[in-house]
């Protein structure tokens, strides 16, 4: 079942975003920052749940997306990550960034939008 919260009386918008995950949340956030009227629709009763996987974001991504992360969404500061692919090969990425509390990050993005 789809759940949505839409302010009473809203009949139109400039941007309709379906899905409040990291991609949809960012689309809604940047559309709202651009002065557009945005409606964000999520099919789960609470944005950020159920948690499907962890989430990391680099400093470069934060800069490119113009995100200033609030402390409550950050789980840990990291100075690189090691990615292990399904075939067992590994690659080390040295970009600094954050491990996020994904459910809190998604809720924050939606609230900001």
PLM regions: where:
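Extreme N-terminal leader/targeting segments of oxidoreductases
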Residues: 1-15, 33-34
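N-terminal Rossmann-fold NAD(P) dinucleotide-binding loop
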Residues: 24-25
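Conserved N-terminal glycine-rich FAD pyrophosphate-binding loop of Rossmann-like flavoproteins
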Residues: 44-68
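Short, well-ordered alpha-helices that flank and scaffold nucleotide-derived cofactor binding pockets
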Residues: 29, 33, 63, 111
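Glycine-rich FAD pyrophosphate-binding loop
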Residues: 16, 20, 29-52
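Conserved glycine-bearing catalytic or ligand-binding loops at nucleotide- and phosphate-handling centers
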Residues: 77
């Amino acid at each position: 079942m789809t759940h949505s919260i839409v302010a009473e009386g809203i009949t139109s918008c400039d941007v309709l975003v379906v899905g409040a995950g990291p991609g949809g949340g960012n689309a809604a956030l940047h559309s709202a920052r651009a002065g557009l009227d945005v409606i964000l629709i999520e099919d789960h009763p609470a944005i950020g749940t159920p948690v499907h996987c962890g989430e990391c974001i680099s400093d470069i991504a934060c800069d490119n997306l113009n995100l200033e992360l609030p402390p409550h969404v950050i789980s840990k500061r990291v100075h690189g990550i090691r990615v292990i692919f399904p075939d067992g090969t590994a690659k080390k990425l040295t970009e600094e960034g954050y491990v996020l509390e994904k459910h809190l990050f998604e809720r924050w993005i939606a609230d900001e939008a």
